[in-house]
Design a protein with these regions (language model features):
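Conserved ABC transporter NBD signature motif
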Residues: 93-101
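Conserved ABC ATPase signature
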Residues: 174-178, 182
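P-loop NTP-binding/switch modules centered on Walker-like glycine-rich loops
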Residues: 197-200, 204-208, 212-291
């Protein structure tokens, strides 16, 4: 598998932008919350507060697609990834995998699912055991899960090394003998060794040299295309996310503030925070019209005591009194493409306040409301 056989844009465009309406999500997250306790006092440690790292997150991931998760450092995206793989225990909420809630599953119940949900970590230097050979590292998941591929584990590991662009002769080498990009390829080989259905990639290229990043992204896209793996791709670089992901969710201070398909979000962002993030992405075309850079005032509030109402209001140029008293729901607004959800009382794009008539209601909720109105009309008659 060659790194340069395809560009990232070309590979990403191979995936359809529309899904069959009957397709069930592979992963469904509802109200996912993770609060880390803050301990204080001596000699008895007691909880004096909580860091609200993730605070009520909702999204879905469909088979074979890539969902990008973006936001500033500290927004909760990496914590979300570790919750999905159950490296962290959720405080509240549900994580449904293939329709089964795994948010409270114990180790025995998670055992058959572990092989189907894998993770690629950010730091290729810290995520590989320096005392193990490449062969031992990649075959580790097979040994843990009792899997013996045809021809044996060594043969399969050598095949995986070729798939990720390394030589089968690297089987007996140690991690310190490889560059950062090569180490991340080893991490990719380990993640796909069990042929999972879902991979959570936590900033897989941010620690790599810029010249290597595109090669690793190309590799991940080719793996996704050939093996049909769904990805949750966590990153802060919106340009890379645009190339890799078919849908993108934007997080701010533990909340998803906007989620949409790639083209809809990048071409018509509705949340002010998304608009500000995109304004900072460098333009590749020097002849293109320069978009105005939006500079956010102030610092990100503390996740220990986040603002009331809309969490972005303390830095938002459109904030009004309503933003401090009412938390905006994540809904589809009129004029948005299907599935483009925004949590804002006063969305961008020149629109006015998101009134009730502007909100495109979920069909199921709309039917329930119509039935209720019909029943009221009959009773009045």
């Amino acid at each position: 598998m060659s790194d340069n056989s395809k560009t990232t844009t070309a590979v990403a465009d191979d995936f359809p932008q529309q899904r069959d309406g009957d397709t069930a999500p592979l992963l469904k997250v509802s109200g996912l919350t993770k609060h880390f306790p803050i301990k204080g006092g001596f000699p008895i440690k007691r909880t004096v507060g909580h860091v609200k790292a993730v605070d009520g997150v909702d999204f879905e991931v469909y088979p074979g697609e890539s969902l990008g998760l973006v936001g500033e450092s500290g927004c909760g995206k990496s914590t979300t990834g570790r919750l999905l793989t159950r490296l962290y225990e959720p405080t509240q909420g549900t994580i449904e995998y293939k329709g089964q809630d795994i948010s409270r599953a114990n180790r025995r119940q998670l055992a058959p699912i572990r092989s189907e949900i894998q993770m690629i970590f950010q730091d290729p230097y810290a995520s590989l055991n320096p005392r193990q050979t490449v062969g031992t590292i990649i075959s580790g998941p097979m040994e843990i899960n009792g899997i013996n591929p045809p021809g044996g584990r060594e043969k399969r590991v050598r095949e995986l090394l070729e798939i990720v662009g390394l030589s089968p002769e690297h089987y007996n080498r140690f991690p310190h003998e490889f560059s950062g990009g090569q180490r991340q390829r080893i991490g990719v080989a380990r993640a796909v060794a069990l042929e999972p259905k879902l991979i959570v990639a936590d900033e897989p290229v941010s620690a790599l040299d810029v010249s290597i990043q595109a090669q690793v992204v190309n590799l991940l896209q080719e793996v996704q295309r050939e093996m049909g793996i769904a990805f949750v791709f966590i990153a802060h670089d919106l340009a890379i996310v645009r190339h890799f992901s078919q849908r993108v969710a934007v997080m701010y201070l533990g909340k998803v503030v906007e989620i949409a398909d790639r083209d809809s979000l990048y071409n018509r962002p509705r949340h002010p925070y998304t608009h500000a993030l995109l304004s900072a992405v460098p333009e590749a075309d020097l002849d293109a019209d320069k978009r105005e850079r939006i500079r956010l005032e102030g610092d990100v509030p503390s996740p220990i005591s986040p603002p009331s109402g809309c969490r972005f209001r303390t830095r938002c140029w459109k904030a009004q009194d309503k933003c401090a008293t009412e938390e905006p729901p994540l809904v589809q607004l009129s004029g948005n493409r299907q599935g483009h959800l925004t949590a804002c009382h006063f969305p961008e794009d020149g629109s006015t306040e998101a009134r009730a008539e502007d909100i495109v209601m979920d069909p199921g909720l709309k039917a329930m409301e119509d039935d209720a109105e019909g029943g009221a009309a009959v009773s009045k008659g």
